[in-house]
């Protein structure tokens, strides 16, 4: 069974037991969180779509770790004007492990 969930403005296809990284969620490491924005559920040949969410469907996940992604380098330049700008950015993330999919 799989589910398509929405968190942090992005959509993820998840399966029970899978680990994946999402935008930072303010939760303690080891705590269980419930993701209730389930857009679709699938099991074999049957797929259940929500409009926009599937009624009564939830995904239970455990917070594994918090961290920061690799640095993204930004470089801006205006030719012939002696203008150069360097900038870097590291996005925070939360790593989750799916415990169960209910619905």
From Swiss-Prot:
Subunit composition and interactions: Part of the 50S ribosomal subunit. Contacts protein L20.
Keyword hit for RNA-binding: yes
Keywords: Ribonucleoprotein, Ribosomal protein, RNA-binding, rRNA-binding
Species name: Herminiimonas arsenicoxydans
Taxonomy, superkingdom: Bacteria
PROSITE patterns reported for this sequence: RIBOSOMAL_L21
NCBIfam families assigned: L21
Record's protein name: Large ribosomal subunit protein bL21
GO CC annotations, alphabetized: cytoplasm; ribonucleoprotein complex; ribosome
GO term, biological process aspect, one: translation
The family this protein is said to belong to: Belongs to the bacterial ribosomal protein bL21 family.
Recorded name of the encoding gene: rplU
Signal peptide positions on this chain: none
Keyword Cell wall biogenesis/degradation listed: no
One Pfam family of this chain: Ribosomal_L21p
Residue spans crossing the bilayer: none
GO molecular function: rRNA binding; structural constituent of ribosome
């Amino acid at each position: 069974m799989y589910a398509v969930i929405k968190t942090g403005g992005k959509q993820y296809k998840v399966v029970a037991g899978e680990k994946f990284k999402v935008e930072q969620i303010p939760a303690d490491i080891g705590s269980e969180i419930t993701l209730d924005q389930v857009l679709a559920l699938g099991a074999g040949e049957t797929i259940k779509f929500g409009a926009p969410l599937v009624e009564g469907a939830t995904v239970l996940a455990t917070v594994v770790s918090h961290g920061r992604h690799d640095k993204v380098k930004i470089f801006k330049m205006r030719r012939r004007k002696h203008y150069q700008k360097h900038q870097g950015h590291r996005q925070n993330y939360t790593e989750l492990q799916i415990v169960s999919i209910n619905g």
